[in-house]
């Protein structure tokens, strides 16, 4: 059976950049596990803040963390109290000086991670998987996407046999490297077990296409 490559991993170095930016030789494994601990902690502490991405940069004994969120006010807190508490806890976790940047996501409906989270939370609230997917597709297309594909898999509707159902609208050119495709997955904990949610969003081309030379032109 044919398998799909990760859409973001395939585009790194072409139109996408790494989420972790640092170089290490002997400490590579330690830094990698530290990155995982940072991401897990941020995801749990800011689970209601619509966090899409966490970028990590390292320089000497300093760690710069950039949090992309649709609700910056919830991350920052009143008078910056929440982000300051987050910084102190990350200082203790890493034993390094941590600097936190907050980047607001202007259009949450064009972010695959946030769309997948929204579908998963609806599934946990016993909303029909068909309705949750179709509503998400409508919102994303209205927000200006060129195409979207969603998939929900597991014991759909409490069925004994797990299956997958997907819906799509527009185009999602996975083989076109210049196509800006955002991909994410999320899990929904239901009374019948876990459901997997996958979302692909095509937001248009990034690199300008070369103009075709007119035959016989100057």
Curated annotation (Swiss-Prot):
Top-level taxon: Bacteria
Any one GO molecular-function label of the UniProt entry: mRNA binding
Domain KH type-2: 38-106
InterPro entries per record: KH_dom (IPR004087), KH_dom-like_a/b (IPR015946), KH_dom_type_2 (IPR004044), KH_sf_prok-type (IPR009019), Ribosomal_S3_C_sf (IPR036419), Ribosomal_uS3_bac-typ (IPR005704), Ribosomal_uS3_C (IPR001351), Ribosomal_uS3_CS (IPR018280)
GO CC field: cytosolic small ribosomal subunit
A GO biological process held by the record: translation
CDD domains per UniProt: KH-II_30S_S3
Keywords attached to this entry: Ribonucleoprotein, Ribosomal protein, RNA-binding, rRNA-binding
Entry annotated with the keyword Disulfide bond: no
Function noted in UniProt: Binds the lower part of the 30S subunit head. Binds mRNA in the 70S ribosome, positioning it for translation.
NCBIfam families: rpsC_bact
Subunit annotation: Part of the 30S ribosomal subunit. Forms a tight complex with proteins S10 and S14.
Family classification: Belongs to the universal ribosomal protein uS3 family.
Protein name as catalogued: Small ribosomal subunit protein uS3
Origin species: Listeria monocytogenes serovar 1/2a (strain ATCC BAA-679 / EGD-e)
């Amino acid at each position: 059976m044919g398998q799909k490559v990760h859409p973001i991993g395939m585009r790194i170095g072409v139109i996408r950049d790494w989420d972790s930016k640092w170089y290490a030789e002997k400490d590579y494994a330690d830094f990698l596990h530290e990155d995982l601990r940072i991401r897990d902690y941020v995801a749990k502490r800011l689970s209601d803040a619509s966090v899409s991405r966490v970028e990590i940069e390292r320089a000497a004994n300093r760690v710069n963390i950039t949090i992309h969120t649709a609700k910056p006010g919830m991350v920052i807190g009143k008078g910056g109290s929440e982000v300051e508490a987050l910084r102190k806890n990350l200082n203790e976790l890493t034993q390094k000086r941590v600097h936190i940047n907050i980047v607001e996501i202007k259009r949450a409906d064009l972010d695959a991670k946030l769309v997948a989270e929204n579908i998963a939370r609806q599934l946990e609230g016993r909303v029909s998987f068909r309705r949750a997917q179709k509503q998400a597709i409508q919102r994303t297309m209205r927000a200006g996407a060129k195409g979207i594909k969603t998939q929900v898999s597991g014991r759909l509707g409490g069925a004994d046999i797990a299956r997958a159902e997907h819906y799509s609208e527009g185009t999602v050119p996975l083989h076109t490297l210049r196509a800006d495709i955002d991909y994410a997955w999320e899990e929904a904990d239901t009374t019948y077990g876990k459901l997997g949610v996958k979302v692909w969003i095509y937001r248009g081309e990034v690199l300008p296409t070369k103009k075709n030379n007119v035959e016989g032109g100057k």
